[in-house]
Amino acid sequence: MLGNLLRNKTSSSGFEKSSEHSDFSSVVPNVPVYCKAASTGTTKTAAGALLDTAVNVEKPSEMLSTTSPPILDHISDDLKLKLFGSRDIPYSRPIDTLQNNGGLGTDKITSINEKTYAFRILIIEEAGQMACRNNYRDIFDYTTSKISNSMEQIRPSELKEYIFGSPVRSSDLTQCDKIRTIPNSDLVLITRIFYYTHQYNRIAISLCIPRILLPVVAESWSSISSWLTQTQKMLIGFLTKNRIMQENTGNYSNNSVIKLSNIDIRTHYPKEIEIMVQTLQKRVIPGLRSMSEIPRLFLYPETFKEFVHVWFKSIFNWIEIKDGPKLGFLPLLMAMIISDYRHTIRELKTSKIVILSGNMVVANKLLFILSALLEPKYKGQITIRRENIRSDSSAVSRNKSNNNFVDKPETELSTLTSTDNLLSRTENNSNHNYNNSNVSSNSIGSPNFHSLRKGWQIPNRRNSNTSVSVSSSESLAEVIQPSSFKSGSSSLHYLSSSISSQPGSYGSWFNKRPTISQFFQPSPSLKHNESWERLQTTAGNMQRTSSSSSLQQATSRLSLTTPQQSPSISEYDEYPWMGTPGSPNVGDVSHAPPLVKNISYKFPLKNVELKRDCQRISQDDLLDEAFERICQPSLADLNSTYEIFPGNSSYADILTTDSDIDDGLMNKPLELLPKYTMYLTHFNNFFQLQACPAGQESESRITNSMKIDLLKADYTRSLLVSLRSRDIRDVALKREFTGNNNNNSNQNIYDENFVGKRKYVLKQKTRKIFSCGKIGKLSTSLENCVNFVENSIKSAMMLYDDNGIDSELRDSEALRIFSSLVHYCNAG
């Protein structure tokens, strides 16, 4: 019966409203998390579990789309490992299902429907009759959706023990906030208890939400507490007006008790009630959903050499393809974050870094580069998954049949394909199963390939009539060129787009360094079937046409398979795929035979195995170790002087020890990830690092969110990076008070105990750091940091260009350069 808490009460059906979908575009102030007791002055914390049980749904309902899963489905596995440290990030899945399937790495995803995020508001008042069984009055009951009346409903009176506690209590002035789960149900009850003039008729504001949102309740407590405070002030206002009316009519005395049950708040105050419900439905609940559904970036430890290699490779590719040797966009942006925003974004919760771009791939690559410079980084150990060695006879026979690959160079291997094997490749990519059947490629009907040596060179037409025997189980993703390399009829079009088809490109294809790009080679995702539709950009972009079909689409028509949507030309312009013979486009080597792995590019992070969900990292091992050290401590664990006081009949033995906790341990992130995320379809105020589409709408959302942040702070700051116009702006917004109508000027005007009003004005300051290829006026410290970043990148380039250097020496030098960048401000 308790499992039906979200069902509406029959007596309140007259005030029911139809279900409304939450609006992700709503923004809520992003402030520190705390739980407070209203009058006792104590502080309470609410700890969420790593994953919790989802709401059980008896029958399927209308599906409610989420923000993250569609985006993650179209991000390559390599980029997932860069951003999140894992290929699989579970969304809203029951913890029992995860445990039964071997932890967090399962491939099943539980659907999210509108009932999962339903909520219920309960306002209950004590009647002041402690000896009476019916000591509670139902003041207000609201739920988001209409549920069938045939289902069992739970009455607010049945929740009195959860809301008010034991009916036998002492007469005190207890006012507090409580968070607890309802037994035998998937619901969380958040309650604030207070009283107006008499302690015998306490009032409770209760919010029931799905238990699936429990892990983010503590982190989003400021938004929930703000809504509870707003509702409490509203109810106190109702009681105050009623008391004034009784005083005017002569019906009020000192012993009179003002009760909400004597006021029909739905009839007399419909506007205030509507504001209360809409604030919860369009601000608080969407905020909880955003924190629960949108995955956060994982910041690798600075001593993890595999990550450092990939990070430098990403910087080299960006400079070669995007910036060129003279632009200096990326070094300046990195210096701005190192010298300023790295500390600001951690100390000032209202500061943000937003990348504006119409290309999700480019924005995510830049997010990966910038996030490595931010704190707090993960300090724990990273598990490296061992590669499975296939020693069965089938694998041996497959290796023997593929010996002809050894004598082929990589550039030639990237031009060999088979249209007859495309169907088998598609099936094997979805199943990841290997078989022993070998199929010879057929040269009849094979499409033409183009060899492209440099971005400014017209592709040379070349036929691929060579036949080669390959296993049908092999992934041929490495031979599928992106849509940018198409038929020779439009080669001149690609020549112009390669040179400068995007405003501000500044000939980024010139002066390339092939040795660096060959040192690391990217690995696109093997996902197919579903296609990601690129967001429409605003006016001003050049219109591009792609009339000719890509190789994958042409071969798909021959094999009667559903083609995958090819990347758009604008994506190639902003960040070209590394698919030329100089740096072949190789698929995920984890699905290739062992012999092919030896000649293919091995992504350094491909074996990273991190158990996590959208918000947290699994720390079960550390928790078990800490629990054992607490239960069975050793003298070495104490690490300080201690004293044992023997117990007696009243208490047990007591051990006292000096508590000397250093800053490194206090700042060590163990579970919760920082509020840094990926490219989103809309700007989200809850995250401090993100990317969103470029345009006036996004900039308007950012400005509005900064104004909302000023409700809880006097200063907010945002770094806006526009990849379309190559623009870096530092926008600051502060609130200055011009008058004071209250003697206490140090008190926050939005504090719940402060009723005074103060006039203030908003002042905005915009500083252009980089605009239209020109560097703005920089401070001396920022100029020094820019020079340091440029010299560090040059040193890293020379390090990776030196093929004769020992691998261990390269690792140590790369770690040293990266550490100097991360700790630049501390060292300086």
Swiss-Prot record:
Domain cDENN FNIP1/2-type: 310-712
InterPro entries given in the database record: DENN_FNIP1/2 (IPR037545), LST4_longin (IPR041153)
Region: Disordered, residue numbers: 1-25, 392-411, 423-444, 538-569
Keyword Phosphoprotein: yes
Record keyword Transcription present: no
Composition skew (Low complexity), residue ranges: 543-562
Domain of life: Eukaryota
One example of a Gene Ontology biological process annotation: positive regulation of TORC1 signaling
Spans traversing the lipid bilayer: none
GO cellular component assignments: cytoplasm; cytosol; FNIP-folliculin RagC/D GAP; vacuolar membrane
Domain dDENN FNIP1/2-type, first and last residues per copy: 718-825
Residues carrying Phosphoserine: 401
Ranges for domain uDENN FNIP1/2-type: 114-302
Ranges of compositional bias, category Polar residues: 392-405
Pfam families reported for this sequence: Longin_2
Loss of function: phenotype: Sensitive to high hydrostatic pressure (mechanical stress).
Function of the protein: Involved in extracellular amino acid uptake. Required for the trafficking of the GAP1 nitrogen-regulated general amino acid permease from the Golgi to the plasma membrane.
Family assignment from sequence similarity: Belongs to the LST4 family.
UniProt name for this protein: Protein LST4
Organism: Saccharomyces cerevisiae (strain ATCC 204508 / S288c) (Baker's yeast)
